[in-house]
């Protein structure tokens, strides 16, 4: 006997209906940033460079000018191949790769017996995203003549090699086709700065003290939540448990 066409048609119809109801898991772009921040504050944890130690404790305070830099990675890409270019000062703890949903840090200090502060740039490659994320900083020795500067930026897609000239460009130059950025003097106003492009956003804070602290968050832009770190995405998608009713 041949297959009865009405039965086959019914099976195909049911299959298509089921497939139509199996929507792919997609993060809604309407999720507000404040909710992402709330979840990230619970999910992002210290990596090996901060295991059992506070950020301030990384600074070598036997020197009067230091800077500690902390980066939180809220994106799904690893931040790899860190590269530091020091203009003034020396590195005391080196930057390392940063896994998704982790925070890592490193520290720098002034050079011994010099009248200079600490200044330089550090960058990480966004693994599989084919671009590099860059931080510029300057903590002065003479607070009356120089400011507390920080810059945040990112290279174009396809450019992953670090450049020794990024510090100078971000301190006193302007964005170009290879590197776009924003910068700010934190000497009198310590409000956050934000750099953004079509896919990513970087937010940074800097204190204006001799032992400066820089705290950075790299995250997807609000129309690109699919690039959030998996741990953050899972927490955002998790439905809250219904409140238990009390027995009368």
From Swiss-Prot:
Family to which this protein belongs: Belongs to the actinoporin family. Conoidea subfamily.
Tissue: Expressed by the venom duct.
Subcellular location: Secreted; Nematocyst; Target cell membrane
Name this polypeptide is given: Conoporin-Cn1
Disulfide bond residue pairs: none
Gene Ontology MF terms in the entry: toxin activity
Subunit details: Octamer or nonamer in membranes. Monomer in the soluble state.
Signal peptide region: 1-23
Additional comment: Found in injectable (milked) (IV) venom. The mature peptide contains 1 cysteine residue.
Coiled-coil spans in chain: none
Lineage: Eukaryota, Metazoa, Spiralia, Lophotrochozoa, Mollusca
Any one GO BP annotation for this protein: monoatomic ion transport
Residues binding phosphocholine, per UniProt: 120, 138, 140, 167, 171
């Amino acid at each position: 006997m041949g297959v009865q066409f009405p039965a086959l048609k019914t099976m195909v119809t049911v299959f298509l209906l089921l497939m139509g109801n199996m929507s792919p898991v997609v993060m809604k772009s309407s999720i507000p940033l404040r909710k992402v921040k709330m979840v990230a504050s619970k999910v992002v944890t210290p990596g090996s460079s901060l295991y059992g130690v506070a950020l301030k404790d990384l600074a070598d305070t036997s020197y009067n000018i230091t800077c500690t830099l902390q980066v939180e990675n809220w994106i799904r890409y690893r931040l790899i191949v860190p590269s530091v270019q020091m203009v003034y000062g020396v590195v005391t703890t080196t930057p390392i790769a940063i896994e998704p949903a982790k925070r890592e840090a490193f520290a720098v200090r002034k050079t011994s017996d010099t009248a200079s502060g600490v200044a330089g740039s550090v960058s990480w490659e966004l693994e599989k995203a084919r671009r590099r994320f860059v931080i510029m900083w300057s903590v002065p020795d003479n607070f009356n003549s120089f400011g507390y500067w920080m810059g945040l930026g990112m290279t174009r897609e396809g450019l992953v090699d670090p450049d020794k000239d990024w510090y100078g460009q971000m301190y006193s130059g302007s964005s170009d086709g290879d590197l776009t950025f924003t910068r700010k003097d934190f000497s009198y106003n310590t409000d956050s700065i934000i750099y953004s492009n079509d896919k990513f956003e970087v937010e940074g804070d800097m204190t204006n003290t001799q032992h400066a602290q820089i705290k950075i968050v790299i995250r997807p832009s609000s129309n690109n939540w699919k690039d959030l770190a998996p741990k953050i995405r899972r927490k955002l998608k998790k439905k809250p448990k219904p409140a238990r009713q009390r027995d009368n």
